[in-house]
């Protein structure tokens, strides 16, 4: 079997992406099969550095309790839900939230 040699490029926690629409500061972006959080606002066609790992607070789907460690997804309204959709998981719940909660901490890309 051949040996493959890799050259270290970067830690991989930050990814720079092209903005195909205006991007808001801390906006959650789908980048291929992962999600990333914009580190700054940028205009359409600009480039923005995004966090591809870490724990972030996002709006949570109303009237849904989510337990710690549950795989979570983005629903059509832009809220975090435990109900799987057609998009990949955003990550896992990093906080336990009741149905009354309006936000949740999520460790992305886990």
Predicted regions and their residues:
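Surface-exposed, low-hydrophobicity beta-strand/loop segments enriched in small/polar/acidic residues
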Residues: 1-110
